[in-house]
């Protein structure tokens, strides 16, 4: 009986991603709700309380006798998080961002009309404890717009405002809230399919994290078939989930990724509750992070791409970082260096002398996944709702009507649909107009009474298409062993970024946590070394920017991520100084 009860609970819990039918009256009630309260994470989320303790521990550790200068390469969430926690630890971070705006993969900018274009449709979950703690630390929690606790799926070809949905009842803990919400729903999966899937997932619940980690080497589809779960379950449920998690299909995504997400969402009462930022992530999140860092003595610079990591070639400091060459032949140096760049960028900048080291050679197997983010401004309001919607579309992952869901983009005139186009591998090189046409064809299926691909119904007033050729790292089977730890074999070089080792995989939460871990690594290494005879590697003299150098005045357009331009050689005076330093160290 106990086993049967567990199987039923597992089936109903997994089916938390498989909603029932919701029609117009219920949706109207949902849209009317405003000002949904922040969930009480202090009460419902053990990970949130752990995140609070970890941040407090950084602040309470002994202050350095001499604050160290730490250069952080990259002004996305990982880099800004690193710098935020470094100033909390009493050090002096200098953030170097290649573009002229902060945010990296969450960057956003305004066009000539004042409308915002985002790199991606970014949502925050209750199961993002470190992100939630960051908002609390910055005193900007009111900028998160929480939505009704529901997971909503489109029903392609259906009438206006008809969705597959399930609501998590308030007042019940996880996973009971998911089970209660789902048991009555039979919209997408039959009971035999639910039970088959539930039985397949029992080991994950019985053996926990150890079992989850063991599934890293198989794809979602392989895992399902090995357990006799029908392909229809994968098609109806896990295509949408896989595309939302990593922008790829279940025949390539590692099952570990799905199991980690399920555990995070279903072990925390408010884990799957969604919030959207009330505007541009660059303005509403990254700028407050910058202000916090600078108010405590840190520095944040933009439009300063790194072109070479300069390393010592001889002596006791061999292979350690001597400084960085920036555009315009500017040279900067520090006590420690943290890379918070995307994985494809640090792969390009990795010095030749490091590439044979196992730490870096493994990392070379990681790669970013392509994704496209689309904004379409329509001439009228569409039948949408105030929440994120899983599209269940061939080409679209998720979408939201930002004129309804986001205060910063609200409009009473027309809808602005923001959509994630994924998988994008076959589309990333195509013209924007072709991508728009394909998107409109998908929207005609999702909004059959309101949109026609030929534009004969709702009219497109304008659109933007943001292509990111290498976004978050592609979570393929076998890639977990390639992910680098924060501490590297180079004594003054630390790694951050969502691809580095941390438990939240490729996500905003993962990026923020990686920054905290990188800052902690600097703090702990420096404290250990302060009580020993360890000497930090010698530093190159800093040199000013020279505007006459090739590409010195080049600026990356807003809609593009910076593509690393590796310097072919060092300026002669820098090369001479480095040679003198290394020769002296060899003799000494």
Q: Which ranges hold each PLM region?
A:
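Extreme N-terminal leader/targeting segments of oxidoreductases
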Residues: 17-70, 88-89, 545, 549-587
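Mid-domain catalytic core of redox enzymes
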Residues: 66, 89, 304-447, 562-565, ...
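Mobile amphipathic helical/loop "lid" adjacent to a hydrophobic cofactor/ligand pocket
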Residues: 131-132, 136-137, 141-259, 267
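Helical element adjacent to the flavin cofactor pocket in flavoenzyme catalytic cores
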Residues: 259-336, 340
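A conserved FAD-binding loop/helix module that cradles the flavin
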Residues: 501-522
């Amino acid at each position: 009986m106990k086993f049967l009860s567990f199987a039923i609970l597992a089936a109903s819990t997994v089916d938390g991603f498989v909603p029932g039918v919701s029609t117009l009256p219920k949706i109207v009630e949902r849209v009317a709700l405003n000002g949904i309260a922040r969930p009480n994470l202090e009460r419902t989320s053990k990970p949130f309380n752990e995140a609070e303790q970890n941040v407090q521990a950084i602040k309470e550790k002994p202050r350095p006798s001499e604050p160290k200068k730490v250069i952080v390469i990259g002004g996305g969430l990982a880099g800004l998080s690193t710098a935020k926690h470094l100033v909390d630890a009493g050090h002096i971070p200098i953030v170097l961002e290649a573009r002229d705006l902060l945010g990296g993969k969450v960057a956003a900018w305004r066009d000539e009309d004042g409308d915002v274009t985002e790199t991606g449709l970014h949502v925050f979950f209750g199961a993002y404890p470190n992100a939630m703690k960051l908002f609390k630390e910055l005193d900007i929690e009111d900028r998160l717009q929480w939505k009704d606790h529901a997971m909503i799926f489109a029903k392609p070809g259906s009438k206006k405002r008809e969705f597959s949905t399930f609501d998590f009842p308030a007042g019940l803990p996880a996973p009971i809230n998911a089970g209660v919400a789902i048991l009555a729903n039979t919209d997408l999966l039959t009971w035999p399919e639910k039970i088959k899937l539930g039985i397949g997932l029992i080991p994950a619940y019985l053996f926990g994290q150890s079992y989850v980690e063991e599934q890293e080497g198989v794809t979602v589809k392989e895992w399902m078939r090995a357990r006799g779960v029908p392909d229809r379950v994968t098609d109806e449920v896990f295509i949408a989930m896989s595309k939302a998690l990593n922008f790829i299909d279940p025949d390539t995504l590692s099952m570990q990724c799905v199991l980690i997400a399920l555990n995070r969402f279903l072990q925390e009462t408010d884990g799957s509750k969604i919030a959207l930022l009330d505007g541009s992530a660059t303005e509403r999140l990254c700028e407050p992070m910058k202000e916090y860092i600078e108010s405590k003595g840190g520095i944040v610079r933009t439009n300063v791409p790194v072109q070479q990591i300069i390393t010592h070639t001889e002596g006791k400091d061999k292979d350690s970082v001597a400084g960085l060459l920036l555009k315009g032949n500017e040279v900067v140096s520090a006590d420690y260096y943290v890379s918070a760049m995307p994985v494809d960028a640090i792969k390009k900048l990795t010095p030749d002398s490091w590439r044979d080291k196992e730490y870096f050679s493994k990392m070379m197997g990681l790669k970013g996944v392509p994704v496209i983010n689309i904004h379409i401004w329509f001439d009228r309001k569409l039948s949408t709702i105030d929440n994120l919607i899983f599209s269940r579309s061939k080409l679209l992952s998720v979408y939201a009507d930002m004129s309804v869901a986001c205060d910063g983009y609200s409009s009473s005139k027309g809808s602005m649909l923001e959509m994630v186009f994924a998988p994008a591998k076959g589309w990333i090189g195509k013209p924007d107009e072709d991508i728009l046409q394909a998107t409109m064809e998908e929207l005609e299926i999702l909004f059959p009474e309101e949109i026609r691909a030929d534009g004969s119904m709702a009219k497109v007033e304008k659109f933007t298409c943001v292509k990111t050729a290498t976004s978050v790292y592609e979570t393929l089977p076998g890639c977990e062993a390639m992910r680098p730890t924060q501490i590297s074999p180079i004594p003054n070089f630390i790694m951050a970024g969502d691809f580095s080792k941390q438990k939240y995989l490729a996500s905003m939460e993962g990026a923020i946590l990686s920054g905290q871990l990188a800052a902690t690594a600097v703090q702990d290494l420096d404290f250990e070394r302060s009580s020993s005879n360890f000497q930090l590697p010698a530093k190159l003299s800093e040199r000013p920017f020279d505007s006459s150098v090739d590409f010195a005045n080049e600026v990356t357009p807003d809609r593009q991520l910076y593509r690393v331009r590796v310097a072919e050689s060092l300026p002669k005076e820098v090369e001479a100084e480095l040679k003198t330093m290394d020769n002296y160290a060899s003799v000494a």
